[in-house]
Structures are given as structure tokens and as C-alpha cells.
Regions:
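A broad, low-specificity signal marking well-ordered, structured residues that form hydrophobic/aromatic
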Residues: 1, 31, 48
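A structural detector for beta-sheet-dominated domains
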Residues: 4-6, 34, 43, 51
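A short, structured beta-strand/loop element
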Residues: 25-39
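Short, compact, well-ordered microdomains
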Residues: 39-68
């Protein structure tokens, strides 16, 4: 399942990856990590891909958590 924020983001994935647990791999184009036991890919524009997960309600909640953490950590770097 892929979810995208209503507002396009500009997330520095290399920078924010240091604050995420269970990062599987990261580049300037994507960050793969585990969140609540789910494999997730975050993209710089704020899109979030959940693998083998189809619960839309919880997906929106988890995407908000991920984007919120990434934005907070990205702003902390400024």
C-alpha cells in the first residue's frame, strides 16, 4: 500500500535515517526500515510504501507517525 501526503515534502533521508530504528538501507532516493513490525519505504516527497499491509486506517496513522518523525528530525538538522 502506498500513501502520499496532501502536501509534498522535501525530506533529507540520509540525515533523518540516523534517528530511525531498524533502517534496512538508505539513499538520497529512499529509506527502507521497519515500523511497528512492517517493512516501510519512505521517499523524499513524503510518500510511504507499506509492504504486505492493507489496513488503510492504520496505514494512515502509521504514515502520519513516520512523516511526523522525519519532518521533526529533518527540522532538527537545520
Amino acid at each position: 500500500m502506498m500513501l502520499s501526503p496532501s502536501e509534498r515534502q522535501d525530506i533529507d533521508l540520509m540525515s533523518v535515517s540516523k534517528s530511525f530504528d531498524d533502517v534496512l538501507r538508505v539513499s538520497k532516493d529512499m529509506m527502507e526500515f521497519m515500523h511497528r513490525g512492517i517493512k516501510v519505504t519512505l521517499y523524499p516527497n513524503g510518500s510511504v510504501m507499506f509492504y504486505h499491509f492493507t489496513d488503510l486506517e492504520n496505514g494512515r496513522l502509521y504514515a502520519d507517525e513516520v512523516i511526523g518523525k522525519a519532518r521533526q528530525d529533518d527540522n532538527d538538522e537545520d
